[in-house]
UniProtKB/Swiss-Prot annotation:
The gene is PRM1. It is a multi-pass membrane protein. One of its GO terms (cellular component) is plasma membrane. Residues 38-104, 318-410, 630-643 are cytoplasmic. This is Plasma membrane fusion protein PRM1. Glycans are attached at N135, N145, N198, N232, N253, N474, N496. Its main location: membrane. Keywords: Cell membrane, Conjugation, Glycoprotein, Membrane, Transmembrane, Transmembrane helix. Belongs to the PRM1 family. It is found in: Cell membrane.
């Protein structure tokens, strides 16, 4: 009954039903739920610690939201109000300057309309008379000089022959006189008299009316007073008070006219301690919430674990029944094989030797089944027994022990344990790689940039807001100028075109009527005095109106707005400085805490895998204990049989 076989019998099989696949699956589910619960508790504890530790920061940001928003809105509003008032004063000063310019131009126009017209006509008449006289005198002098020179030339040519005859007579008389007179009487000779008459006739060729008369007339024409001189002098006298007024207006500083911006109230930022804030005042309530969550988590874990344990115990019943049915079938097969009489047709049926030989060569069917369907454990057991056992009984014990340790049920925790150890090793490698990356230079640089980019992001957002607001102001200004003042541009452009065409027509008409005549310039002057100057003044006024009549709305300057909102003299709060300085440390600590949590979870998984390996290793002492128990029972039975 207690003989050792190289395979497992029913009791030995039933000793391993607790490591069936269903029980192991439920045990793994329990471990998974335990890991999940542990992770959840760790997360809740981290959340609790984080919330309680960051109460001061929460209160700080809450104070910024509660008190900082009115503060910065007040500063921005004060800047916008001051900027709007400054722009209003500048617009008013520009309007006063424009009004002074308009009044000055109107005064110039009235002077030119009433006084300038008569003065222009008077001086134009004088200038025209002088110019006509100058032109006539030039022509008369030219004709007279030309005629006198021609007559002198003809007279000189007629007397040329007489001069030659007289010269010969004079030469003859000179020679005769030298014979009868001495040298002292030479000057009273007829020769000298004839020479003087000849000289007076020759000088007629150079007689002409002097051109200095034309020069004097031209000088008189150039010295004739001009309308432009009088007009410019009059405008200069009239412009003096207006220019003084405009200089005084331009010298006014719009900013200095405004009151000090510090007089406008700005709500202060409460940078005090946050001990009496919302978070700190409800610290007990926060802890109570986390205690309730942990209690609910523990109750859920206990209920789930008990339920799974009960189901795992219930799974032992079908496993035991399956092993029992399997053993019954194997036993029936073995009994059937033993009862079959396999006789040799050539052997002696009455020979006892033949029966003894058949009995000794008969094999165990269960052992054959074990060798066929569990080949690896059988071969390993036979190989180990062949190299270590010295007796048949020892070989059977070794084969049985290896069959027990390497049974299909015992191999399940072995496979799960080895797979778990491999997976845990891979997870530890991944966590180690993440820790190396966390401590790398690139991560530190990224965290430092995260700390220093806050001011840049705020400035960028403020610049984007200013740009969008200025774009809206530009569109509104263009719409107002086009909708309300567009008719001014259209009207001034049309009137300027009409005035320019009228001036061109007047000039062309005067040119056609008086071109190449002495009256051309006087008529041009008269027309300019009566009509042209007025039209040109109107054209200049329309051009000025076209260029200056428009609405210019004030723009928002990003740099000024940033300077107005910023507070360089505000004392830095230690809590705020600590928040900025510890930002990278808190991020690094948070990531390291997550990695630590993952490492703890992987460590638990490794312990579970090692526990599964321990379950498989536990089969060895259990098998040895069962072998010892069977040997003890066999020896006790032998002692009972001995009389």
């Amino acid at each position: 009954m207690y003989a050792t076989q190289p395979y497992l019998e029913l009791r030995e099989r039933l000793s391993q039903i607790w490591i069936n696949r269903y029980t192991l699956l439920l045990m793994l589910c329990m471990v998974k739920i335990l890991l999940f619960t542990s992770s959840l508790r760790f997360s809740l504890n981290n959340s609790k610690v984080h919330v309680l530790e960051e109460c001061s920061n929460i209160e700080h940001y809450y104070n910024i939201l509660r008190n900082g928003t009115p503060h910065y809105m007040g500063k921005m509003g004060n800047y916008l109000v001051a900027h709007a008032l400054e722009a209003t004063v500048e617009s008013l000063l520009a309007l006063l300057t424009s009004l002074a310019t308009v009044v000055e131009v109107v005064a110039h126009f009235m002077i030119e309309l009433w006084l300038g017209t008569y003065a222009c006509l008077l001086f134009s008449a004088a200038h025209g008379a002088v110019e006509v006289a100058t032109n006539v005198t030039e022509k008369v002098i030219g004709v007279a000089n030309k005629t006198l020179i021609a007559a002198a030339n003809e007279l000189d040519n007629g007397l040329d022959g007489l001069s030659k005859v007289l010269n010969k007579i004079i030469e003859t008389g000179t020679k005769v006189s030298h014979l009868f007179k001495d040298d002292d009487e030479e000057h009273a000779s007829p020769e000298g008299q004839f020479k003087k008459i000849n000289l007076t006739i020759a000088s007629l060729r150079t007689v002409k009316i002097p051109e200095s008369v034309n020069d004097k007339l031209r000088s008189l024409a150039e010295k004739t007073p001009d309308f432009e001189d009088v007009k410019n002098k009059t405008k200069g006298l009239v412009s003096i008070p207006f220019q003084t007024l405009k200089n005084e207006i331009n010298g006014i500083n719009a900013t200095s006219m405004l009151k000090n911006r510090k007089l406008m109230s700005v709500p202060p930022i409460d940078m005090g301690d946050a001990a009496d804030g919302v978070c700190s005042a409800n610290r007990d309530g926060i802890e109570s919430v986390y205690r309730n969550l942990n209690s609910a988590l523990i109750y859920s874990l206990v209920a789930t674990a008990v339920s799974l344990a009960i189901v795992a115990l219930l799974c032992l019943i079908p496993a035991a029944w399956h092993e029992y049915r399997q053993w019954e079938r194997l036993s029936a097969l073995r009994d059937h094989e033993r009862t079959v009489d396999c006789k040799d047709p050539f052997a002696d049926t009455h020979s006892s030797a033949s029966a003894s030989t058949a009995s000794s060569t008969r094999c165990d069917v269960i052992q054959n089944y074990q060798g066929v369907f569990h080949r690896a454990p059988t071969l390993i057991g036979e190989w180990v027994a062949r190299h270590t056992a010295h007796t048949q009984e020892g070989a059977l014990r070794i084969q049985w022990l290896l069959a027990y340790v390497l049974s299909p049920r015992a191999l399940v925790p072995l496979a799960l344990g080895l797979a778990g150890v491999l997976v845990c090793g891979c997870q530890f490698l991944i966590i180690h790689a993440l820790r190396i990356q966390l401590a790398s230079t690139s991560t530190r640089d990224s965290l430092q940039r995260l700390e220093t980019d806050t001011a840049g992001l705020v400035a960028h957002d403020l610049s984007r807001w200013a740009d969008s607001t200025n774009a809206y102001i530009n569109g509104t200004e263009a719409s107002v100028n086009a909708g309300l003042l567009g008719w001014v541009t259209t009207a001034t452009t049309a009137l300027n075109t009409t005035v320019a065409a009228l001036l061109a027509d007047i000039d062309s008409t005067v040119d056609r009527a008086f071109a190449d005549t002495p009256l051309h310039r006087p008529m041009v002057t008269v027309v300019s005095c009566v009509i042209g100057n007025k039209l040109r003044a109107i054209e200049a006024g329309l051009t000025w109106t076209h260029d200056h009549v428009r609405i210019a709305l004030p723009r928002i300057h990003t740099a000024r707005l940033r300077d107005a909102v910023a507070e360089p003299d505000l004392p830095t709060h230690p809590a705020y400085t600590a928040v900025l300085q510890s930002l990278s440390d808190r991020l690094r600590h948070s990531v390291d805490r997550v990695l630590h949590q993952c490492c703890a979870a992987v460590r638990i998984e490794l312990y579970v895998s090692l526990a599964l390996l321990g379950l498989w290793i536990l089969q060895t002492p259990l098998g040895l204990a069962m072998l010892l128990f069977k040997s003890h029972c066999r020896r006790r039975n032998l002692r009972r049989r001995v009389p």
